[in-house]
């Protein structure tokens, strides 16, 4: 009896970088380094926020949520990417593939949700600073975190089940070194219309998050322009720089990939694979760096911890 009902395919094949399979071991070095830095950076953010009472504020709680989603993205894709690039082990069972998709898409939706509530945080801090603390209480922040986690799970939990009901006859070659819903459903030899529609719905949810983020920044910009002092304008705008960088590093690869899939007639498979890998590697790596550099309270606390360790 096969892994999937009436299916012939027992194994999906992942792909590294086409034509450069002989150099996979060399590509694995920067990939491993990026994963290591991403995990260390996000763990550092979480540790500093947890251990420093002065950082127990809404802005930093949301940053901790972003670090959790970044670590989730990294750890979800890490096993298969390392297997492909380190050991040229391309095979993955359908059930393992579906499980990986659940976590990758789940943490993607979670990151999108976190970026949205972080934009709300910036809007409240700039537009209504006097009521900021009374509106975003610790209890409300915890409830928001719980809601976005539940939202992420509920949105992606149908993915594994809708994929399991499909039949996979002959095609088994995936397009990346990890599993994605839109990639796997194309291998099916049965009707995948439900998967196409639901995948489009999830994409719309993510784009709705982006639209609301853009709207929040329109309102933020309107508020900033109403401030009389130029120095105060720049100070208010500077508090948004880290979040804007996080939004760009997360959404630009997604939008670029979607545009290439829909509009580029002669797209290069190599370019598509590199951009897809950037989507999972760059945000978890860059977010801790950007927030540590741009947020004085964080790098001061990190520096203080390092000096305490060195002084012992």
Swiss-Prot record:
Cystine crosslinks: 97-189
SUPFAM superfamilies according to UniProt: Family A G protein-coupled receptor-like (SSF81321)
Membrane side Cytoplasmic: residue ranges: 47-54, 121-139, 217-236, 294-312
Q: Name one GO molecular function term.
A: G protein-coupled receptor activity
Q: Does the keyword Cell cycle apply?
A: no
Membrane protein topology class: Multi-pass membrane protein
The record's section on CDD domains has:
7tmA_OR51-like (cd15222)
Q: Which UniProt keywords apply?
A: Cell membrane, Disulfide bond, G-protein coupled receptor, Glycoprotein, Membrane, Olfaction, Receptor, Sensory transduction, Transducer, Transmembrane, Transmembrane helix
Annotated Pfam families: 7tm_4 (PF13853)
- The record places the following residue ranges in the Extracellular compartment, namely 1-25, 76-99, 161-196, 258-272
Record's subcellular location? Cell membrane
Please give the residues the UniProt entry marks as glycosylated: 5, 192
Its cellular-component GO annotations read: plasma membrane
Q: What task does this protein carry out?
A: Odorant receptor.
- Name by which UniProt lists this protein: Olfactory receptor 51A7
